[in-house]
């Protein structure tokens, strides 16, 4: 069974969200998603300054098996991307909740957090 940290929120499309000390939100893909995709070969990240609505496709993870769209879990502005992934996309595989984060955003509607899954609900969703 995949690791699903309790302190994170999730989308059923396998993105996770973590609130940072500065009020921004880090976003990545779940361990379950990276296991399904296999070894990452490239991650196409959004541009800093771009604005997305919740559910918009904003990035692409390319693995040896497939390319998969990554969706914005919250509406907001991209304020940082994990530039280390350009040369080390495998970080998404080795540390999906750590060094493999994809981008950070400034949420425009924190009320959208209520639409995300908690760890228990996400575990139930991926077990089906």
Swiss-Prot record:
CDD domains: GCS_H. The keyword Cell membrane does not apply. The keyword Magnesium does not apply. Keywords: Lipoyl. The glycine cleavage system catalyzes the degradation of glycine. The H protein shuttles the methylamine group of glycine from the P protein to the T protein. PANTHER family: GLYCINE CLEAVAGE SYSTEM H PROTEIN, GLYCINE CLEAVAGE SYSTEM H PROTEIN-RELATED. This is Glycine cleavage system H protein. It comes from Erwinia tasmaniensis (strain DSM 17950 / CFBP 7177 / CIP 109463 / NCPPB 4357 / Et1/99). The lineage of its organism: Bacteria, Pseudomonadati, Pseudomonadota, Gammaproteobacteria, Enterobacterales. The gene is gcvH.
């Amino acid at each position: 069974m995949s690791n699903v940290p309790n302190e994170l929120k999730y989308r059923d499309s396998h993105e996770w969200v973590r609130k940072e000390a500065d009020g921004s939100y880090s976003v990545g893909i779940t361990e379950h998603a990276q296991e399904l995709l296999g070894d990452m070969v490239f991650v196409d990240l959004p541009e800093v300054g771009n604005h997305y609505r919740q559910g918009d496709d904003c990035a692409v993870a390319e693995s040896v098996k497939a390319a998969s769209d990554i969706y914005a879990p919250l509406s907001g502005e991209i304020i940082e991307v994990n530039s280390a992934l350009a040369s080390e996309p495998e970080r998404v595989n080795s540390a999906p909740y750590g060094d493999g984060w994809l981008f950070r955003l400034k949420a425009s509607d924190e009320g959208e957090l209520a639409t995300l899954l908690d760890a228990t609900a996400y575990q139930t969703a991926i077990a089906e």
